[in-house]
Amino acid sequence: MPKVQSSQVVLDSAYRCFCRNGFRRTTISDIVEEAQLSRPTVYKYAGTKDEAFAKVVRVRLEQAATAAGEAADAARSPEAKVLGVLTVKLEVAIRLWDDSPAHAYELLAAASAHTPDLVAAYTDHLARLLASALDEAAPDAARQAADVLLTFTRGLEDDLRDTEAARLGLRTGVRMITSGALSRPVILPA
């Protein structure tokens, strides 16, 4: 099997194992069995369980970051750009919940604990996309609004039992938050 194909098989197998067993209960033996490759081949492409997990997280976040950038580029209005970026973020969480309803919380926590730099880089990328979308209309509030929008979306990701309600909540929240960020700022007394 060619290198790229073997590497992809190993990472796809690792993802399925993490989704099925959770982070704590997945072993390299599980990944070897799922990939139907030799143990040395799995170690070559995945490394340890922690390294395999980090590689899976990296690939998933890189794909999501690319999709978020494309969504922002395709949209015409600041609100549509924001909604496009945050829809990508929410859909990543929905996919994880669909793939691993029993272990989604654990996997999200493991990603934050075991790959904090990857998660932070992804979040920063999204914040820059959001701030850029809002910057022309609201340069003073763009980064703050981006942070609020990301926090709001993380809140929606906490309970994805009803994905349509989460999607509707995202659209409603984006409309409300961006309309506030894009309106003339109100200066409150100190």
Give the predicted meaning of each segment.
Residues 1-5, 185-190:
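N-terminal intrinsically disordered/low-complexity leader segments
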Residues 5-14, 31, 56-68, 130:
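Generic hydrophobic, amphipathic alpha-helix propensity
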Residues 9, 13, 17-51, 55:
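Helix-turn-helix
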Residues 49, 56, 60, 64, ...:
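Hydrophobic/aromatic residues within well-ordered alpha-helical segments
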Residues 80-84, 92-117, 150:
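Amphipathic alpha-helical segments used for helix-helix packing
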